Amino acid sequence: MAERKYFGTDGVRGLVGQAPITPDFVMKLGWAAGQVLAKQGTKKVIIGKDTRISGYMLESALEAGLAAAGLQAKFTGPMPTPAVAYLTQTFRAEAGIVISASHNPYYDNGIKFFSSEGTKLPDDVEMAIEAELDKPMTCVESALLGKASRLNDAAGRYIEFCKSTFPKELSLAGLKIVIDCANGATYHIAPNVFKELGAEIITIGCEPNGTNINHEVGATDVRALQAKVVEEKADFGVAFDGDGDRIIMVDEFGEKVDGDQIAYIIARDALRRGELKGGVVGTLMTNMGMEVALRNLGIPFVRSDVGDRYVMEKLLENNWLIGAENSGHVILLDKVTTGDAIVAALQVIASIVGSKMSLKELCDGMSMFPQILVNVRFAGDNDPLESEAVKAAQADVEAKLGDNGRVLLRKSGTEPLIRVMVEGEDAELVTQYAQQIADAVKESC
């Protein structure tokens, strides 16, 4: 397959105002997508966004490009990424488009696409869009121009869907939950879901202003949530990222519960109910503790490359239903077509309510190996991973760890970062080894 020019692992993403996240490019992207999608069936596209101030500008640019290609754009306003996937299916649209940079700061943004089935676009469709981007932009005749409209009931539809994934015989009555919406797209969705199911809720990160998305709140920074859970003596806390496809939880003692632990709880509960189909997909970053805990339960486990796209590929390949990344992407294919943080949270809470156990007690069956992740920023065309010094440092650490740990070096798919991960039984040694490799990476940049 030809090398991608514009699409990364999660659509097109970058710094707003710099290529490719400029109004002219995004308009051309809308047109190029329209050229491809118009040949596939209906000419209706669902468009959602998170709460970044640049979303308004990029929304208008997309609208112009799609209209020039003759497509009808249906705008949801601020809406979680998985909600757009769901609405794309229920409205029988040809595609869904999300304007978001997920967990990144407000000054980044991006465009990602969903197919009519609510899944990420196949590689061949993305490559077809890239091919159109390199052609001169044209416009259909005036009578065939696309029109734009708003989906005023989008939020209500998605709230009802989320609630439908929670067992009808259970209730959240009596639970005190702290909800952190990262000042992002779930701010008007998640509180209503949990409240309508009976919980007492306390919210943080629910006051977006266009520039505070993911800032010291949300799934990538749970310190505020940890403090609030302890202060309020809540049963637990739930944090979402800016576009609502990642979840991190916090137990009653303020301890973080990541995507690995969440997937373990959901899989174990499905096994208890006799409803587990197959095994669990993790990634190269998944904690060894999860692998060991699942093995002890007799649940198969495989690893994919990092990225929810690759988790999904492994799930489909094995015909399994549960996949996750430790960063908080949790995919439950019996309920959704992509990572959905609210739905994942509800399944964990169903386990809490159904088992009459606390979140901490549910996590106790899985002992986490100490895992240190160091991000090293790099610039230029050189590849630090090809450095002999880096290879030597990695080999040295792997020899010291033996069978009792792992080393993983990889490039980020969305930022100019080398991610150095070291995992083992001794936290102090793991930290030392990770820094040893990170120093070698820095020196090679």
From Swiss-Prot:
Keyword Translocase attributed: no
Q: Which residues bind Mg(2+)?
A: S102, D241, D243, D245
Q: Which family does it belong to?
A: Belongs to the phosphohexose mutase family.
Q: Which Pfam families match?
A: PGM_PMM_I, PGM_PMM_II, PGM_PMM_III, PGM_PMM_IV
Origin species: Aliivibrio fischeri (strain MJ11)
Which EC class does it fall in? isomerase
Q: Which GO terms describe its biological process?
A: carbohydrate metabolic process; peptidoglycan biosynthetic process; UDP-N-acetylglucosamine biosynthetic process
SUPFAM superfamilies registered for this protein in UniProt: Phosphoglucomutase, C-terminal domain, Phosphoglucomutase, first 3 domains
Protein name per the record: Phosphoglucosamine mutase
Q: Name one GO cellular component term.
A: cytosol
What this chain does, per the record?
A: Catalyzes the conversion of glucosamine-6-phosphate to glucosamine-1-phosphate.
- Which InterPro entries does the record match to this protein? A-D-PHexomutase_a/b/a-I, A-D-PHexomutase_a/b/a-I/II/III, A-D-PHexomutase_a/b/a-II, A-D-PHexomutase_a/b/a-III, A-D-PHexomutase_C, A-D-PHexomutase_C_sf, A-D-PHexomutase_CS, Alpha-D-phosphohexomutase_SF
Q: Which residues carry this modification: Phosphoserine?
A: S102
